[in-house]
Amino acid sequence: MPKDTKPLTTAAQGHDGWDRRSFLKAGGLTVGGLGLASLIAACGAGDGSGPSNSGTLTLRMPFMADMQVPDPDIFYEAEGLQLTNATYEGLAKYQPGTATIVPNLATGWTISPDFLTYTFQLRPGVKFHDGTAVDAEAWQKSFERRKVVEGGPGYMVKGVASTAAPNPTTFVVTLTEPNNAFIHYLACPFKPAAVSPTALSANAIGDDHAQQWLTTHDAGTGPYTIKEFVTGSHYTLEAFPDYWGDKPTFQTVRIEVTPSIANQKLQLDGGGLDLATKGFPVPDILAYKGNPEFTITNTAGGIGDAIYLNQSAGIFADKALRTAVLNGVDRTSIVATAWGGMTTAQPGMFPDKCFPPELAPMPTKIDPQALKTMVAALPSKKLDLACAVDGGAPRQQMAELLQSQLSDAGFDVSLRVMPLAEQFDLTNQPPERRPDMMIAWLGGDTFHLDTTFRIAARTGAAPVNFFQYSNPELDRLMDEAILQPNEALRNEVYRRCTQLVVDDAIWIPLCVPPSTTIAHKNVTGFVSESFIPMTLQLQDLKRT
């Protein structure tokens, strides 16, 4: 008997062999759920007292860098997610602020007991931006396109054996093997989206499935549609008048490519911007918190910051030394100092919404003396510490505080900032050319741990298994986890997976960085995407 649709919590439903082989194939060095770029929203010029009501129909927002192409089957990064989530929608989504899965373009679904067949009841009356109806056959073609395009998020449909459209409002997906993470793929920020077959057919060049056209246009169902997409300059969105849900207040959204946080701050202070969602240093955030003209909201998502240790070469090829670092570093003080009390050190390896921390707690006893003793005996005490650039000022400060602690332990630490291009090329480098230690994000595409383990720790996975960790027992367990019929059994397998990586001391979790929105007090209606909360639901924003 199929199960009735119910909200699914943290670890509902992974996949054997679905590591992201085509992770960066079609769009440059980008990373899902990752990349962590700033988005700023603005409306009109101001006099220092905040944006005026005369500009309520236009919202202006900078990105810190150009985004990847807005094709939903290629796009796979955080920068630009604001745009793609405003133009495309999936069958399901995460309820804001939670790991619970709720309907979106589907009104409900049933899942067979063997996790092989998913039957979706489709929302009636939904239209694509070209005016055509969204029906089950359109969903079949959308799934087919994601599979054949083979972009970064293509792994999400690699395990689909077939789809069916028994009637216009019923869409059936059958998998090749059980996968209790599949419904999370359909709800995450990089989910398979409804793409208009009419637009694809009209704009295809040969067998490119309209990829060229979709570099500057969209074919979705979202509250906004792309009016302009000018690389290196700006992107303009317009409200879709036939949107099935709540109609947007802002008729136009203009996104400027603005790399400088200092420039963004000047515009925010002068009233030229409505809000900022990420990238400001903690002292600035705290200053805005004390300013009655602004409101501050902090939201935690599903990706944490962590210390990576290079177990493949150099001084940390010694497991005992890695363990001494894990037990000797004061994570609590690093996080508290760098973040000014805005977040705390993670109690477990993964964010709370991904896995209950009490099932696999991190050690709480700190033993710096044991680390000092081991370092004193090392023939070379040089340590290359890299800090991934996309974490902004707080991550940089955490790296500096870590450098200080390691220096006190006797290491000769060199700290450097690592560009994203270098970070995502690490798997192509010999082990000895990788840094000894790195601070970067740690997470997957969903709140389900399968995507984290499979992309960051699976044998041979690239490019996010940065130091090419390999543990056959972990590979076996992550394959076992996705077959479990309920959350309790699945969590027990993931507890064992987590214990393996803790015992091997390859990762040391730091914190879940808060996504901070700084807004003029007359801007309201903030609803964030749950997994990557710097992405706002633009249709909910209002100016009072």
What are these regions (language model features)?
Residues 61-113, 144, 219-221:
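N-terminal lobe/hinge region of extracytoplasmic solute-binding protein
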Residues 95-96, 190-247, 252:
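Gly/Pro-rich hinge or "lid" segments in bacterial periplasmic/extracellular proteins
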Residues 121, 155-203, 228:
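Surface-exposed binding/hinge segments that line
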Residues 240-286, 412:
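Ligand-site clamp/hinge motif
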Residues 517-544:
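Long beta-strand-rich cores associated with HINT superfamily self-processing modules
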Residues 414-424, 451-520, 544:
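Extracytoplasmic/peripheral linker and loop segments enriched in polar/acidic and small residues
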Residues 340, 344-377, 392-397:
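Structural transition elements
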Residues 1-22, 33-38:
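N-terminal secretory signal peptides
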